[in-house]
Every structure is written in structure tokens, then in C-alpha cells.
A protein has these predicted regions:
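Helix-loop boundary and gating motifs at the non-cytosolic
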Residues: 1-39, 192-230
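Helix-to-loop junctions at the C-terminal end of transmembrane segments
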Residues: 44-58, 141-142, 240-253, 339
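Structural signature of the two symmetry-related core transmembrane helices
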Residues: 61-75, 154, 256-271
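Helix-loop junctions at membrane interfaces in 12-TM secondary transporters
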Residues: 77-90, 273-284
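Cytoplasmic helix-loop-helix junction between adjacent transmembrane helices
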Residues: 91-125
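Symmetry-related core transmembrane helices of the 12-TM Major Facilitator Superfamily/SLC fold
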Residues: 148-166, 346-364
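Juxtamembrane intracellular "pre-TM" segments in multi-pass secondary transporters
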Residues: 167-199
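A late C-terminal transmembrane helix in Major Facilitator Superfamily
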Residues: 313-342
Length: 365
């Protein structure tokens, strides 16, 4: 239930939140800064909250309260229309919801280990609800009805808060105090640092798509309903990959998955810049199963293999903080500037980041 509700909310947030910001009058550069701010706050908040989760084991009440506060934050945002108030309230709201996913991922990964379950099969239900949200959102918000977006986020965050109460506490698996100093060698090892850099490069190559894909597609004549279909096709490809790879999760190594993701990203971004027809975009969106899905499964496989269970929330948090915090936080303002200056041609720049990751992974392999 957690994955179902959480990814339903972010099936609204990811494609349509920039649309709401655009329609209330923010420029692409300002939108880039607002989106980046939501990632920057991870750097400060996420490690602290993860440490609390590891040392107390009270993941249930902690995550429920944070998601409830996030709902309040979005309700406040509904009355704002200028950049600085929106930016500041976004920072506060993001401080509440950003730490939740890595904490819950660590709990679910540990549960999957104990119960001999496949993470990919569990995670795909989040992708299913993401598709429902993007398709339904495209229809609901079409024709200038973007004012509805924020209230769907408020209600959705509230439902996620309730679902957090259904997840077992970390203490029910094995409650152990974090020993960060003991595991400093792991987090500072060349392999772990290399993992963060290569996965980070793949991740930030999505910046123009995540921040401005909806705006770009609308600017070239596609309706919100069709744009919702574009996003849904990408996540449907994720589901297929999670299902297929999930059957062989223990046999498929993280290095192969990351190589697959980087190679697909190198091809995907320049082709999105070149082709703008509905059919072409639908076909190219199927590559999302590789550029995101394979990268995500590869990252989770690496963390499951190399990070001890007693600091799993901290390990997950460190990954999300650096990849989704520092990397994305630095990249999104640049993506806003690139999109403002280059429009769809900004995708060519994204391919360069994926190419650097691919070359590095090939050297390692």
C-alpha cells in the first residue's frame, strides 16, 4: 500500500508540478530553482532523519508524521503565486517528504531479504499507480485545469501518511544502533564512490525530462492528455523490466544493469531532441524502463549486497542524498537555463552525462 499511494502522488508531482508552477507565472529558470531546492534540502535533512530511523527503529510514526506535514505544506503552497514564498515553503515541505522513501525502501528491502521476496516485484506496484496517476492527470488537468494539481497532491500526501502506519517498524526486523564510524571504510571506499558517481551521472541525465519534459511537449503541440500517455508509457516500460528482471534478480548483477541504463540513456536523449511526433516519443519513452528502471534496480542490488542491514537506512539515505540531493540539486537550475535557451536541444547535453557514465562503467567491467 505504501508504494501504491506514494507513487500515485509522485505520478502527479513529477509530470504536473512544473506545469502548475508555469501556469501561475514562474519562468523556466525559476521553476528550475524551485525543483532544485526540493533536492538540496535532502543533503541536510535526509541523513539526520535516516540516523534517527536507524537508532530508534520507529519508522512507522516518523514517516507518517513527515508525510502529514508534507500535505500541510502543499496546502499552504496553493495560496502562493510569487517565486520567493514558493521557493521557501517548497524547501520546508520537501524537508518533510524527501526522507520518507529511502527509509521505507530500507525497511522493505530488509523485509524482502527475510521473507525471500523479490524487490522488483514489490516495487512494480508503485509503477502501476504512477501510470494511473499520469494518465488520469493528463485527462483531469487538460484544458487549463492545472489548478487542481496541488489539491491532488494534498490528498495524496495524506493517504501516504496513513499507509506509513501499516508498514512494520525497523525494530521488528533487527533493531541495532548505527555504527557509522565502523562502516566509514565502506562509504569512503573507491567502489562505493565510483558507484555514486556513475549512478549519479545516469540520474542527472534525466534532469531536462523530469523538470521540463511536460512543458516541452506542450510547447510543440501535444495536449496534457497525450503528455500523460507519454509519461505512462515510460513507467509501463519500468513495470516490464521490473517483472522480467525480478525473476532473475539474484542472477543479474548490478554492473550489467547500470551498463544497460547508461547505454540506453546515451541513445534516448538525442533522439528525443530530434523526433517530436507522438509515435516517435511513445517509442522513445519505452527506453525509460532501461534508463531509470535498470539504473534503480542496479543501485538497489549494489546497496543490498554491500551495505550491512543495521545501517541500511543510512546507506539508502546517503545514496538518495548524494544522487537526488547534491547531483540533482546542482543540475536542475542548469537544466532550467538550458531549456530556456535551447528548448528541446537541451536533451543533447543530457546525453553527454550518460556517455561519461557509460565510459566509466565499461572501463570497470
Amino acid at each position: 500500500m505504501f508504494y501504491a499511494t506514494y507513487f500515485f502522488v509522485f505520478g502527479i508531482y513529477m509530470p504536473y508540478w512544473p506545469l502548475w508552477l508555469n501556469d501561475i507565472g514562474l519562468t523556466p529558470v525559476e521553476i528550475g530553482w524551485v525543483l532544485a531546492g526540493a533536492f538540496w534540502i535532502k543533503v541536510v535533512v535526509q541523513p539526520v532523519v535516516a540516523h534517527v530511523a536507524d537508532t530508534t527503529g520507529r519508522t512507522k510514526i516518523l514517516t507518517a508524521v513527515l508525510m502529514g506535514m508534507s500535505a500541510i505544506g502543499f496546502a499552504i503552497l496553493s495560496d502562493l503565486q510569487s517565486f520567493w514564498p514558493i521557493f521557501l515553503i517548497t524547501l520546508i515541505t520537501a524537508a518533510c517528504y524527501q526522507p520518507v522513501l529511502p527509509i521505507m525502501e530500507s525497511v522493505i528491502l530488509n523485509f524482502a531479504k527475510i521473507g525471500n521476496l523479490r524487490y522488483g516485484h514489490i516495487r512494480l506496484w508503485g509503477s502501476v499507480t504512477f501510470i494511473i496517476a499520469t494518465l488520469g492527470g493528463g485527462w483531469l488537468f487538460d484544458g487549463g485545469r492545472s489548478d487542481r494539481i496541488i489539491w491532488f497532491l494534498v490528498v495524496g500526501m495524506t493517504l501516504v501518511s496513513l499507509c506509513c502506519l501499516l508498514i512494520p517498524n525497523q525494530a521488528q526486523f533487527e533493531r541495532t544502533k548505527s555504527r557509522i564510524k565502523t562502516h566509514a571504510k565502506l562509504f569512503l571506499s573507491p567502489l562505493f564512490i565510483f558507484f555514486l558517481i556513475t549512478t549519479g551521472l545516469i540520474h542527472i541525465s534525466h534532469s531536462v525530462l523530469y523538470g521540463f519534459g511536460t512543458l516541452y511537449w506542450r510547447s510543440i503541440g501535444h495536449s496534457e492528455t497525450i503528455i500523460g500517455l507519454f509519461w505512462s508509457i515510460g513507467v509501463l516500460a519500468e513495470i516490464v523490466l521490473f517483472t522480467v528482471v525480478g525473476r532473475h534478480e539474484k542472477q543479474v548483477g548490478y554492473l550489467f544493469l547500470l551498463l544497460l541504463a547508461a547505454a540506453a540513456a546515451v541513445a534516448r536523449w538525442p533522439l528525443l531532441a530530434i523526433f517530436d511526433s507522438q509515435i516517435a516519443i511513445i517509442v522513445l519513452q519505452t527506453l525509460h524502463g532501461f534508463t531509470f528502471g535498470a539504473a534503480h534496480l542496479g543501485a538497489m542490488a549494489f546497496l543490498t549486497k554491500h551495505v550491512p542491514k543495521e545501517i541500511s537506512a543510512t546507506g539508502q539515505s546517503l545514496y538518495y542524498t548524494l544522487i537526488g540531493g547534491i547531483f540533482s540539486g546542482c543540475m536542475l537550475p542548469l537544466a532550467g537555463k538550458l531549456y530556456s535557451d535551447l528548448s528541446g536541444s537541451a536533451f543533447f547535453i543530457m546525453s553527454c552525462f550518460a556517455g561519461c557514465s557509460l565510459i566509466s562503467l565499461l572501463v570497470l567491467s
